[in-house]
Design a protein with these regions (language model features):
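Bacterial N-terminal signal peptides that target proteins for export
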Residues: 1-8
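C-terminal motif of bacterial Sec signal peptides marking the signal peptidase cleavage site
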Residues: 16-18
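Bacterial signal peptide processing site
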Residues: 20-22
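Flexible, solvent-exposed loop/hinge segments and secondary-structure transition points
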Residues: 25-258
Length: 258
């Protein structure tokens, strides 16, 4: 009996070998083919680390004039993701991290994720430009409910490490998030939070420029205000004490005048 079973087993192995390339046993043929083109950016080597991010954040309010807002961009959180959406760095501009808005930590992460996730190599998309598109009656209504923030990335008001290396996600559709580029290749996203969304955008813009990571030769992703620039599907609401490029543009419309 043992001899019979041994013979049957040998026959099965020989038959299996004959179904593939000569002399091989076929395994896992149902697996999909792998892409021959690797990701154009891996890891966090193409974006600022925490040591570089903090001075970029601290120096931004003094560059290119007043940034406006409630605190002139001086109490802020910043987050950076890589091209793959993984969180690479967190920074806070104040020495006491808890002196900033605690809620801004998660918002900064989500802004970085959104800017990276909605931009491509040929077309940057700031979170500010998603504002009108994501309102009721517009084509991206509901987008803010997509890609919820990964709870494994949540941290306290002084936590600068939780979430690093993870895809944190989150979707924010107001100012403060910008995609990062090396030439014409998207390498990640930057998110800033801690003031009005208009000032958040201004601080992020200054940081990206100072880091040399602004897109080259592409359509603008700067913030647009209908009250100043005219109607646009990419328009953002005015904020209290709104500045752009160091020039005051106006204030947010009071609620009783809507």
């Amino acid at each position: 009996m043992r001899a019979v079973l041994s013979g049957l087993l040998s026959g099965l192995l020989i038959a299996a070998a004959g179904c593939g390339r000569p002399g091989t046993i076929v395994r896992n043929e149902s697996q999909p083919p792998q892409s021959s083109t690797p990701p154009r950016s891996r890891g966090c080597e193409d974006v600022p680390d925490a040591a570089a991010l903090k001075p970029l954040l601290q120096n931004a309010p003094s560059q290119n004039g007043d940034a406006g807002g409630l605190n002139h961009g001086k109490a802020m959180w910043a987050a950076v993701t890589n091209r793959n959406g993984e969180l690479c760095a967190l920074a806070v501009s104040t020495e006491d991290a808890a002196a900033t808005w605690p809620g801004s930590r998660g918002i900064a992460i989500a802004k970085a994720s959104t800017a990276n996730g909605f931009s491509i190599d040929t077309a940057p998309m700031s979170t500010a430009r998603l504002y009108t598109l994501s309102q009721p009656g517009h084509s991206l209504w509901g987008a803010a409910n997509g890609n919820p923030l990964n709870p494994l990335c949540a941290g306290s008001a002084v936590d600068l490490t939780t979430g690093l290396g993870k895809v944190c996600g989150g979707t924010i559709t107001f100012g403060g998030g910008l995609a990062l580029y090396k030439g014409q290749t998207r390498v990640g996203g930057l998110g800033v939070s801690g003031d009005t969304s208009c000032t958040d955008h201004e601080i992020a813009k200054r940081m990206r420029e100072a880091a040399g990571l602004a897109p080259a030769g592409m359509p603008s992703d700067d913030i647009v205000y209908a009250a100043v620039d005219g109607p646009s599907p990419f328009a953002h609401a005015m904020c209290q004490n709104t500045y752009r490029d160091g020039k005051k543009l106006g204030d947010e419309t009071p609620a009783d005048k809507d």
